[in-house]
Amino acid sequence: MKIVFSDGRDSVFHTEELPDTRTVDSVAVTQEMIRRAGDTLKIRFTQPIRNIHGYWTSEQYRPQMQLPWDLKLDSAAQRQMPFLVWFDQAGVSQSAFYLTDTADDASLHSQLSQSDSEFRLEWTIRLSPETQAFEFVADRRQLPFPDMAASFRQRLIPDNPDFPAGAWDPVYCTWYAFHAAYTIPELEKNAALAGELGFRTFILDDGWSYDTSKRLNSSTVPEWFSENGDWILSERKLPGFADHVKRVRDMGFNYVLWVAPFLTGRSSRLYAELKKANAILLESDDGSAAADPACPLIGELVIPRILEVFRNCHLDGLKVDFVDFVRPSLTIPRGRECLKLIRILAEQLRAVKPDALIEFRQRYTTPAMLPYGTNFRANDVPFDYLENLHRCCQIRMILGDGVPVHADPICFHPEESCVNVARHLIASLAGVPMLSADLTKISPEHLAVIRRFMRFYHDHLTTFRTGHWTIRYDFGHVASFTVENETEMIAAAVTEIPPAPAGKNFILMNLSAEDLPFEADRIEDCDGNAAAVLPPGGIAFQKTN
């Protein structure tokens, strides 16, 4: 396998040959090679299209069972990661390629060549003065493709950071329930009910920094984010907010506030200043704009204002959103600036509160961001428990065991069946459960299902927190997941029942569309009633002898 290195003008200055073996091989990109490349490095190589039937990058929420004519993956510290794996129909990897430089802006381009029966690949990396020596890795072992992502992660971060206990607490979030239309009495009524159900973290989402009260719909979308960006608490909407935070914390909650440091609204004062400084990277059709993280205003004004609210209101954490709004770019690279500001924000939050909770969203739940976050959440999937499952499993595949992967908030129609509510809860157990609903309007039957699964989560938290996770795929879809420790295995069956463990308790949850014949000591339906077979939304308990 020939690897060709060139500069931005396509002048080749280095080549290497890797053996055609089922091994892990790497090429060191030295400081001398970085110097010779200048500001742009290109790495070219090819992949024979032999027993390849699918691929996966972090851009996809599930593996793709087709061959792309033209594939492009842009990555930087704040969005996606420089990793690609090709696999066969059984999901066994045929090759994985990645860079250990995850901070710099990079773009991978793959083109299918019919005449040569191969993929022609080129990685372009925009280098910076801070770029250190790194590796280009070709892993051609034949293993289940999720193991390739694990190998990538372990090469970058051999050991996980320590995460605060609160990162494993089930979360109540206001977003789908209220959007930006809420009052303090409504928030506290829902906090009280959420606490009774077993939730221990309360996220106040968008809406706290402006007076307008609104729900997300076709009339509000065009200017939804227009008032964000100044990060000053709305005393009109939330009078006595610090006292409110104390009351909710006294109920046993961690209180977390939504922020978006790189997003500014077109009606904000900050937007005008950024515009004057030519520091707007992107205008969107929802009233928002992406602020340039290289602009001093972000570090000198935005982050201090966010920290001021955090300190003054005695908060427990921040939901740090839209970091990925700053897109990877070879012309305006901002990966390192984003990483620097997120690191500063995390350090200053932890200086105030060492166990501060910091939520990141899916596109930046990557090894590069692992040291700076505590809660790594699936991207938005309202009403869709199957996609929530897939997104939790993808983050788990990227970040591995012992990391607080969080489900996107569960939300469902008021007249949804209890079976489907149970399915929502089972899917969320691929991570830490999160819910967003006006609990004053939820039926007693739905509340009972939620309460039951929250009790199950708390009872088995040690396994979820410290166990080893296995995600099994079948033709591009999650077939099952398991998490196990020394004493028990917990599993969810979607299209298959995973093999039972030897000498351990086995708990099986049914996320499939049909009854599952399964021998167990106890089988319960979605409501907790005894059942003869394992129905959808049910749980079976098989004890070891």
Predicted features by range, described:
Residues 1-158, 515:
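N-terminal accessory beta-strand-rich subdomains and adjacent acidic, glycine-rich linkers
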Residues 168-172, 176-307, 311, 315-317, ...:
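Aromatic-lined carbohydrate-binding/catalytic grooves of carbohydrate-active enzymes
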Residues 239-248, 253, 337-356:
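Alpha-helix-loop-beta-strand connector modules within alpha/beta enzyme cores
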Residues 266, 271-300, 304, 343-441:
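Glycan-recognition surfaces
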Residues 317-348, 363:
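P-loop NTPase motor core
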Residues 425-467:
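Catalytic cores of secreted or luminal carbohydrate-active enzymes
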Residues 426, 472-522:
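Carbohydrate-binding surface patches
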Residues 517-545:
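C-terminal beta-strand-rich structural cap/linker in extracellular carbohydrate-active enzymes
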